[in-house]
A protein has these predicted regions:
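Short alpha-helical "packing" element that flanks the helix-turn-helix/winged-helix DNA-binding module
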Residues: 31-41
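Short, solvent-exposed segments of well-ordered alpha helices
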Residues: 22-30, 64, 68, 99
């Protein structure tokens, strides 16, 4: 799949109504989410390994993104995801998930 195919897939994914709602309420910026998707899934979509400068060119922005800027945004996204996972682990360890306060969120996550 060519660059246009990957970008079309990326744009379609980011415009999904459920993705928009979840992303809006997450700790990831739109740019971080886009960068993370490119890093994790673009090689599968492209059908070949990609270098980071190639991944940087897949961003949807018209401005040229350097490999360094791509990697910096990717690192920020990864740190935010890791912190979110640690937050979930902490709340689980402290028994917060057993509280009824989070029931509606747990129910929603089970329906996804």
């Amino acid at each position: 799949m060519q660059k246009n195919g990957v970008q079309l897939w990326l744009k379609k994914s980011l415009e999904d109504p459920l993705v928009k709602i979840l992303a809006k309420n997450s700790h990831l910026t739109k740019t971080q989410l886009e960068t993370l998707l490119i890093d994790v899934l673009a090689e599968n979509i492209a059908g070949k390994p990609l270098k980071y400068d190639e991944k940087a060119r897949l961003r949807l922005t018209k401005a040229k993104i350097s490999r360094g800027a791509f990697n910096r945004t990717l690192r920020q996204a990864q740190e935010n995801v890791i912190k979110a996972i640690y937050t979930v682990l902490l709340l689980g360890y402290l028994g917060i998930f057993e509280s009824t306060a989070l029931d509606k969120y747990i129910e929603i996550s089970n329906k996804l």
